Swiss-Prot record:
Prosegment location in residue numbers: 19-43, 74-123
Keyword Signal found: yes
Keywords attached to this entry: Amidation, Amphibian defense peptide, Antibiotic, Antimicrobial, Cleavage on pair of basic residues, Cytolysis, Fungicide, Hemolysis, Secreted, Signal, Toxin
InterPro entries: Bombinin
Native source organism of the sequence: Bombina maxima (Giant fire-bellied toad)
Any one GO cellular component localisation term in the record: extracellular region
Domain of life: Eukaryota
Protein name: Maximins 3/H2
Signal peptide start and end residues: 1-18
Predominant place of localization: secreted
Function: Maximin-3 shows antibacterial activity against both Gram-positive and Gram-negative bacteria. It also shows antimicrobial activity against the fungus C.albicans, but not against A.flavus nor P.uticale. It has little hemolytic activity. It possess a significant cytotoxicity against tumor cell lines. It possess a significant anti-HIV activity. It shows high spermicidal activity. Maximin-H2 shows antibacterial activity against both Gram-positive and Gram-negative bacteria. It also shows antimicrobial activity against the fungus C.albicans. Shows strong hemolytic activity.
Amino acid sequence: MNFKYIVAVSFLIASAYARSVQNDEQSLSQRDVLEEESLREIRGIGGKILSGLKTALKGAAKELASTYLHRRRTAEEHEVMKRLEAVMRDLDSLDYPEEASERETRGFNQDEIANLFTKKEKRILGPVLSMVGSALGGLIKKIG
């Protein structure tokens, strides 16, 4: 009889333990679901804030670009514009990362690069050639 009593009590303890483990698993899974839902909400709010910031930055960059667009720029302002254009490209690449590399490679047109170099050469060579021309003119006057 003692043996039957011990087996019955052991069985009751084992079933109670199994139920508590099952309840713990259910509460953990419910907690996980609630936690995951709250994380989704937080990500959604963060995404909305990030998209708002990106929109504000894009708007500010476009406003600055339009301000500098219609007047003669200094070299410093030109560098600021280049940085703004880079920021705009970076912000666009956040929205569409797979298209960013295509846009960057399309942006480097060989004709545009050649035109940039010729503009730089003209800007550098113009004053140098005028100085050489005036020096040669002065030498010819002294000789002649």
